Amino acid sequence: MLRLPLVLVWSLWASLTVAENGLNGWLRYAPIPCDGRCHKALPSRIVALNSTQGSPLETAIEELQTGVRGMTGKRLSVAKENNCNLHATALIATVEEYRRTCRNSSDIPDLDVDGFWLRTEGNNVQILGQSERGALYGAFEYLSMLAQGDFSSVDYSTSPHAPVRWVNQWDNMDGSIERGYAGPSIFFAQGQIVPDLSRAKQYARLLASVRINGIIVNNVNANATLLTPQNMDGLARIANVFRPYGIRIGIALNFASPDTLGGLGTYDPLDPSVISWWGNITDSLYERIPDMAGYLVKASSEGQPGPDTYNRTLADGANLFARALKPHGGVMMFRAFVYDHHINESIWTNDRANAQVDFFKKLDGQFEDNVIVQIKYGPIDFQVREPVSPLFANLYHTNTAIELQVTQEYLGQQCHLVYLPPLWKTITDFDLRVDHSPSVVRDIISGERFNRPLGGWAAVVNVGTNDTWLGSHLSMSNLYAYGRMAWSPTDDSVEILQDWIRLTFGRDQHVLDTITDMSMASWPAYENYTGNLGIQTLTDILYTHYGPNPASQDGNGWGQWTRADHDSIGMDRTVKNGTGNAGQYPAEIAEIYEDIDKTPDDLLLWFHHVPYTHRLDSGKTVIQHFYDAHYAGAETAQGFVPQWESLRGRIDPERYDAMRTRLVYQAGHSIVWRDAINNFYWNLSGIADTNGRVGHHPWRVEAESMQLQGYQPYAVSPFETASNYTAVVTTSNSTTGTASTTLDFPSGTYDVGVNYFDMYGGKSRWSLYLNDKVVGKWEGNSEDVLGHTPSIYLDGHSAIRITFNGVKVRKGDRLKIVGVPDGVEPAPLDYVVFLPQGVID
């Protein structure tokens, strides 16, 4: 495959002089080295057979013109008449129109719906789609090749893995986004659809370029007011924006809408008045949006209304909507995320992980053929590691789709770098061995394994108005990769990532290698410093889903239990002695999970309750593995900062600085995670770290041990989220606090870190002094910078570190920190750490 040589000086000049904020994502169409030879390798005109205004073919023309001009400076003309002459031409059409106009079909490969054929030879380019949407995908593919410097001749066809490739937005009518970390909604504000949908159009471009064909625009915890006539008109405007990109819109529904909006006094799915009401609503929507994709419903879960109120089945509920949609060709996506969040942990056999199979298996075959059951990838809730949901192996006669999460609800909320495809592939590549036959999850959701007509993919994305879309430039790799995987799930995670890097940051080899190394290390690192051995992400499940709080997993009805006590830990999900969850899997898989000696260590605590002293395959005990993994993960995160800093001057300053800020934050917050989890289990088990690290921090100065004026000690809760379990806060919200001490460290050059708490509801200010000389000043404004769910408490969510590098310190120097409170935030401090070169606290 021929790639044009990179003119390094020219490309560096381009990257340094063009400021980029991330809004274009991977569709930058940035200039590439292109001389006369390059121009000759490009077509000079575009012929689009039977293109109509507002069609995906017209969009393809616009993208080809914009892309080629942006990358090479060459302007492509558009032929006004249909012409099959390929000389110096990019011909784009549907297969049907090409056969009709050009009367030549001998060499066209067979394509599925949305598939395309791309053939390039010299400056002749042929793009044929089975549909107009497929032709648009082919145009984006050609532009992607050019953007990566690939001008080679190709001749290949590709078709989608599954017909449904949707994204879900959890946008609320007031403009907020549930589990969104990048600003308010691009669709809604103040109970209505926003008047300016320009960002929605840009989002449609990005989605179409990775072959997404459907979007649910509102939160699954839906508001019935979306169905007012005014808002239906607004939805039609959204559909008009997405239609030229081949994307059909759908909406999430509130099951009780016939009562709360329609005033019927009931929402019984078998009541004739309810059936009629939904039929009328559906007809009204299709009058406005003839190509509407369909509905998504969350019912009978987490307080959302559902058919169980009337002793009806989930199939009764799903079929209510499916039958209303069927005359219009719409799809009914029904979430399998149904469970009781008030179950009793004291009953050993209770298990939220059993809920999906318990609710849905008995209904297999009772759903209409346009219903797809949308199943989260694991049995609980988007954890850092879960086994495959057993429901995939228990629905033989029902269409299914997998639900992934691009938004990092439990995985660092875009403030921690976590490249997700390696995690997703542990699920999609897993062979469930149904009836002792190959039953790979990706083949189940495509419909191939059980011969189902529908199926596919859904991902919760939650972009916002932030210029980066997701809050973090590097998190966009997950959205790009999701689209690629939904089209072709056997694609390699590294190859997908590197295509995204070249499209997003250019073709500099050092940039490519560095971001690849960081990204591929990121999920293992996050798993290491959050939750190991299948114990789940040990975050605060009762509050933000962000920082550490392992105690929150237990003692409540939400069912994300660890059953940790002073001696042992883990869920016993065996049939023999536990909840029976292992028995929900096909026999070959059940045998593995039932037997502790066969269960892989990375899922040990998911399926087995063991003593902390249980030996793993590595020879380590469970508790020592916890300690070691948390230290290893945090150490990896520290390395992300110098790796990124090696890219200074190779990436434009705006994106470089924004990403460096997040990686520096992640390095500090990974230490918070490491210490919190290790201290919690050390305190619980009483078993010390054999390497003597946990609870031993010789380079720290605890704030409460310093001389305090205007500050007072404060017992932090959860206790483990503060070093030595204690912070200091100002004595009042109007009192300036001072903490000072004389340093006893050897003279030398140190990186000085200050761990503090940045609470929501105030922006305190701090100043750090050595011998009354200012080392640095900062403000507690992370809520304006980072975007994760904030906290009003001193805890693992608000805990944060700032570091001042290369500070010269002499033994006997006087350290002083002055904190000025603001609002409800009492300028809280945890500790100061003095790190010699090469030392990780």
UniProtKB/Swiss-Prot annotation:
Disulfide bond residue pairs: none
Signal peptide positions (record): 1-19
Intracellular or extracellular location(s): Secreted
Glycan attachment residues as annotated in the record: 50, 104, 223, 280, 311, 344, 466, 528, 577, 683, 724, 733
SUPFAM superfamilies xref list: (Trans)glycosidases, beta-N-acetylhexosaminidase-like domain
Originating gene: aguA
Entry's Gene Ontology cellular component terms: extracellular region
Cell inner membrane is among the record's keywords: no
GO process annotations (BP): xylan catabolic process
Function recorded in the entry: Alpha-glucuronidase involved in the hydrolysis of xylan, a major structural heterogeneous polysaccharide found in plant biomass representing the second most abundant polysaccharide in the biosphere, after cellulose. Releases 4-O-methylglucuronic acid from xylan.
Family per record: Belongs to the glycosyl hydrolase 67 family.
Enzyme Commission number: 3.2.1.139
Catalytic reaction equation(s): an alpha-D-glucuronoside + H2O = D-glucuronate + an alcohol
Membrane spanning stretches: none
PANTHER family linked: ALPHA-GLUCURONIDASE A
Keywords: Carbohydrate metabolism, Glycoprotein, Glycosidase, Hydrolase, Polysaccharide degradation, Secreted, Signal, Xylan degradation
Molecular functions (GO terms): alpha-glucuronidase activity
Name this protein carries in UniProt: Probable alpha-glucuronidase A
